[in-house]
């Protein structure tokens, strides 16, 4: 991501606690993620926002508020998913919980995937998709949208490079549940 227009994203600590721990304002990116504003998240990322900045990073706030598209985008772009919350909750466990709760939202993307991803990635509409498959296609769409937002050129090489996500994406979700017949 390239920082543009001298916009300051990584803010300084407001003060420090009695034990010397820096106290920050909320990260703008995390705040946008918490309220589900995909457009603002994309804008901040295009300006060079730090995905993992702040005591409660954007990926966690997106998970806790159930904003799946933002979760996919941040995770695909390298957000830290291994941070445990102060109350002991594990982000990836929360993520899986939300994933299973959001079947309806995932279903809605079947037609989008057929209409848009198929043209670019050879999606076979006759092949049932399981959760893993749907995540891969959904993430490709999110990345495609983000690249378009950032006005980056789309080339076949760029598209082919996305295949590495297929190999490494969401390995912690092992269930293969056929949710689309």
Curated annotation (Swiss-Prot):
InterPro entries, per database record: Ankyrin_rpt (IPR002110), Ankyrin_rpt-contain_sf (IPR036770)
SMART domains registered for this protein in UniProt: ANK (SM00248)
Domain of life per record: Bacteria
Chain positions of ANK repeats: 24-53, 54-83
Pfam families attached to this UniProt entry: Ank_2 (PF12796)
Transmembrane segments annotated in the record for this chain: none
Keywords: ANK repeat, Repeat
Name recorded for this polypeptide: Putative ankyrin repeat protein RF_0782
Organism in which the protein naturally occurs: Rickettsia felis (strain ATCC VR-1525 / URRWXCal2) (Rickettsia azadi)
